[in-house]
Amino acid sequence: MQATLMVALGGAIGSVARYWLALLMLPISRELPWGTIVINIAGSFAISFFGALTLEQGRFPIPEIWRLAFMVGVCGGFTTFSSFSLQTMDLLRAGQPGKALFNIGFSVVLCLIAVWLGLLAAERFNGGIEQVAQNVIEEEAS
């Protein structure tokens, strides 16, 4: 029950942060959903960086409940894959397949790069990218 409450609290924080950032990005989001793109890239970096640093074997290990609160709650509430999907479909339905493909490619590639950069940044704290990657794999398997 405590974990559920922590995830819910994290989700509320992430959702509000997403809303505020999307509002800040509105002036430049006329042609493409830049707020959603930036949010997904930032969330991809945050989940990998925080996740790698806070593993039991990481530089800053923390209790699992706090990892859940941030990774499932905050990052889950903050990132916007459903919004990304809907906005891409809206571009397609508006007869703008080029913009839709750009949105897909740009978002996916930069989110993958953000995850990679998050892992590299965590490497500085944890002592080697191979160890970070192995720790993440082991954590996911358990």
Curated annotation (Swiss-Prot):
GO terms for cellular component: plasma membrane. Its main location: membrane. It catalyses: fluoride(in) = fluoride(out). It is a multi-pass membrane protein. Na(+) binds at G76, T79. It is found in: Cell inner membrane. The keyword Cytoplasm does not apply. GO terms for molecular function: fluoride channel activity; metal ion binding. The keyword Phosphoprotein does not apply. The chain crosses the membrane at residues 5-25, 35-55, 68-88, 100-120. Keywords: Cell inner membrane, Cell membrane, Ion channel, Ion transport, Membrane, Metal-binding, Sodium, Transmembrane, Transmembrane helix, Transport. GO terms for biological process: cellular detoxification of fluoride. Na(+) is not transported, but it plays an essential structural role and its presence is essential for fluoride channel function. Fluoride-specific ion channel. Important for reducing fluoride concentration in the cell, thus reducing its toxicity. Belongs to the fluoride channel Fluc/FEX (TC 1.A.43) family. This is Fluoride-specific ion channel FluC. It comes from Brucella anthropi (strain ATCC 49188 / DSM 6882 / CCUG 24695 / JCM 21032 / LMG 3331 / NBRC 15819 / NCTC 12168 / Alc 37).
